[in-house]
Amino acid sequence: MEKYQAYLELRRSRYQDILYPLFFRESIYGLAYGHESFFIENIDYNNKFSLLIVKRLSTRMYQQTNFILFANDSNKKTFGGYNYNFDSQIILEGFGVVVEILFSLQLFISSLRGLESVKSYKNLQSIHSIFPFFEDKLIYLNHKSDIRIPYPIHLEILVQILRYWIKDVSFFHLIRFFFYYYSNWNSLFPPKKGISPFFSKRNLRIFLFLYNLYVWEYESIFLFLRNKSSQLQLKHFRVFFERIFFYEKRKHLVEISTKNCSYTLFFFKDTFIHYVRYQGKSILVLKNTPLLINKWKYYFLYLWQCYFDIWAGPETIYINQLSQYSFHFLGYFLSIPQNLSVVRSQMLKNSFLIKIVIKKLDTIIPIIPLMRSLAKTKFCNVMGHPISKPVWANFSDFYILDRFLRICRNFSHYYNGSAKKKSFYQIKYILRFSCIKTLARKHKSTVRTFLKKLSSEKLLEEFFTEEDLFSLIFPKTSLTLRRFYRGRIWYLDILFRNDFVNHLELKIGYDIL
């Protein structure tokens, strides 16, 4: 049993003086517990974040006591009966940068240790890198769970999570101070329409850091139990969910878990389980019986409720069978149909008919949602008929053509992973004739007259894909090469998605942070 204790050893750096490069300790205690009226001048430090500036600001806030009006500050806060501005944006950006530097390397190294093999880390950055993985793995699995990461989470829980990383007391005094005075303190992630501008706009860096810290925390616990599920068959699951001294319990798991427990959660060994997270949601795909899948479902619910104090109802997690369910993922509709093939086998004078079920991942382009997205951005009407873009009519011909070409090529590049590319021709048709109508509107002409005047066959050829150009240049080429261009092509250079795909995610119902 001692070999498990080495694995369960806490792999987290305990930073003692995380804020020492930025602040004087006396200033932190003064900020957190002092109720004196100390103010600073409103100096234009926008977009000029540096460690030296933050350190000087903290010193001024502690020493200067004169009252000064802030003419350029529209979001004034009241403290002790006066209006003041602590330049919270600069300070939070400053220690956000410091915390990122300290955490990023540690998290990167720990994530690489958790991987069995990392051959090409840069290739994993592409959005398309997940689809070849699905092609190889999903056909052998039978259940999929859609997990919506719950929020809001109380800010005090985040502070407690940071306590197990950092022992610098002044850091927690400062972060509690800002949370209390510059946020609503009830939740870090309020509803969409009520997102606090303090976190979402002015301090996006610290907002993203805290959110990623929260997600990383619950995923680290899940992965730990997943990797050691076969060795933890008789361990009580509530041992892991208690907030106080969780990591100490995890370190000494062997001694603690031997005690008698009233309820026992039996973990199971299953190598066919995969977890993918994206855009505030996650997917758990596995091959198990419905009973064991429901155990994983309630594990997540208990984890959020007992560990993070977040109420997550059963509707947070949906379980579906892959063979009977198609789901939307990163702009594609994915399904695993079962194709039945009949093979005749003959042995001497006897012949047999053997039925073989072949599973294959289908990546379908969601044409109707894409057309709705184009209609909202005024490339076509609700019926799918192309219309001109009057907003672009004042630009040059080269600019208009370049904008349409980039949109069309980005679409073709992103959806080249679909084996049924003919369904995408309607989208290309809308973009082509929307471009022509925009140019005709600019030159105050009809579409027919504009095409005759400029002989715009060349204009339309610019919108052809690689497969179309290949068939035009080499009309008598071999069938093998044509099949190559008709097949799926996943690119490893797609790091971002265009706005239309993001809008498509919103229409389907996926929350984007």
UniProtKB/Swiss-Prot annotation:
One Pfam entry name: Intron_maturas2
InterPro entries: Domain_X (IPR024937), Maturase_MatK (IPR002866), Maturase_MatK_N (IPR024942)
Superkingdom of the organism of origin: Eukaryota
Compartment(s) of residence: Plastid, Chloroplast
Keyword tRNA processing: yes
Record GO biological process: mRNA processing; RNA splicing; tRNA processing
Stated family: Belongs to the intron maturase 2 family. MatK subfamily.
PANTHER family documented for this protein: MATURASE K
Protein name, UniProt field: Maturase K
Record organism: Phaseolus vulgaris (Kidney bean)
Gene: matK
